Amino acid sequence: MAASCPLPVTPDLPTLRAKLQGLLQFLRDALSISNAHTVDFYTESVWEELVDLPPETVLAALRKSASETEALPSETRPLVEAEWEAGMTDFPKIFCETSQKLVSVEAFALAAKYYSVQNLGICTPFEQLLVALRGNQNQRIGENQKAVEFMNMKKSHEVQAMSELISSIADYYGIKQVIDLGSGKGYLSSFLSLKYGLKVYGIDSSNTNTHGAEERNRKLKKHWKLCHAQSRLDVNGLALKMAKERKVQNKVKNKADTEEVFNNSPTNQEKMPTSAILPDFSGSVISNIRNQMETLHSQPHQEENLCFENSFSLINLLPINAVEPTSSQQIPNRETSEANKERRKMTSKSSESNIYSPLTSFITADSELHDIIKDLEDCLMVGLHTCGDLAPNTLRIFTSNSEIKGVCSVGCCYHLLSEEFENQHKERTQEKWGFPMCHYLKEERWCCGRNARMSACLALERVAAGQGLPTESLFYRAVLQDIIKDCYGITKCDRHVGKIYSKCSSFLDYVRRSLKKLGLDESKLPEKIIMNYYEKYKPRMNELEAFNMLKVVLAPCIETLILLDRLCYLKEQEDIAWSALVKLFDPVKSPRCYAVIALKKQQ
């Protein structure tokens, strides 16, 4: 195990359960907003049923709340938010006791902020965890380096942050094997293998993904080798440049010294040594180059340093053993000593174990890893945006396998989670459910509902950053539903319209295309009738906009419930030494930004 500091203190199980109780109290009234489907917004008179305020009032209050939060300095926000707790139990101020309609948007927004992961005080700072895992080892590399060119900006951001944490945990335990569940295209797996020298098994249920990951990894290895070669050329080129500069400096100094000796004492003139004017390829020069590179990366990139970025970023993206030290003999004559040949041979052998192996398998909570991975050893289990039930099943596999010493799971697609207490009237054969996992929520027989889980996927931070909701497309779909109900007598339709909106030039075009896709006779409706529906509901579009903003504001609370459920489950396990929620990503770049992390007790 690497030298390290004590791991950060995290909330214990009783504290987390107390947080859950307060959250449930709020959600019992608020969940009806999240569970309302925008498709049925006009047909079911959703606004009149759930909100007792004008839409203009709701929008103005939510905008004011968002601007006030944004105006607070980041360092003072936790102090202000800590003062909210005293008023959080006075729910009649938010919802009417008799009608259960929303009556105070301000109180609603305040409660929703309080019950988010970031403000509940249940999140462990990423940097604090890294420092504890690493002890006195190297500090975190900044994200201003370019990652592998095969990833977009979002994926690069996610992979760099998560792989850094995983490698730190691996070093902490002295582990070399990693299992990446739901590995998809293999970005995380490849990066862990190539940059950090870990042996990674990427498991995905899609054979297409597995083959794609293999091909991508092959190209990535080729790219990595080119980076390796280029990085050595960069180092050698800089060494030659520095040597030439020193040669010029020595010539100038030489000339000055010679003139001084000649003028002061002509009889003592001596021939200058040849070493004074030859390039200096001693170890000190190479050391100086390395020091420059380290200094460059230990400081923020200033404008004057930009010219060095491309030269040096390659080396820091390579594994530790990928770049060979450049000796003084290698630069001038390009010859490799026997010792260097032997070292390269050893490096090649060691790198054979640092591989990425994509595998195809459908993983459940009962999957037997020994049947999938023949050389299973002490390892870490990770998952980057594991979909639906795979995220909770990752935690179950972790707790039931002694070889898995740590887990780092970032889930997504909450709408695909199976819920134990949803549709209880239906016959069920499933034994292990995606939600709930912990004892407390099982005892409460808590159910979110699919629409609420779907709304948990909404990205509040992106909306706040100006990436607004697609109100018009939602409006088109809600009006279409009323047309289908009135003109075709259909109240529930199992078929989906899909992403037709982006292909349509107008509302009329949207309705025609949608009816055709749904298998309905669109010739039955003249243009005038269709446009009458549009004109009828257009003045009420702001109701839909305001309602969707309420859902967006509430979304973090439902995500908090799901994440707290998983963390409480881990806290209930006896052999787990440490567990936490950690915000890994920038939520604007990657909305599903929270990792559930747990480490087992050392044997």
Swiss-Prot record:
Entry EC no(s): 2.1.1.-
Keywords of this entry: Methyltransferase, Transferase
Keyword Transferase: yes
One GO process term, biological-process aspect: methylation
InterPro entries: Methyltranfer_dom, METTL25, SAM-dependent_MTases_sf
Region (Disordered): 326-352
Functional summary from the UniProt entry: Probable methyltransferase.
Cited SUPFAM superfamilies: S-adenosyl-L-methionine-dependent methyltransferases (SSF53335)
GO molecular function terms noted in the UniProt entry: methyltransferase activity
Pfam family, one: Methyltransf_32
Gene symbol of the encoding locus: METTL25
The name this protein goes by in its record: Probable methyltransferase-like protein 25
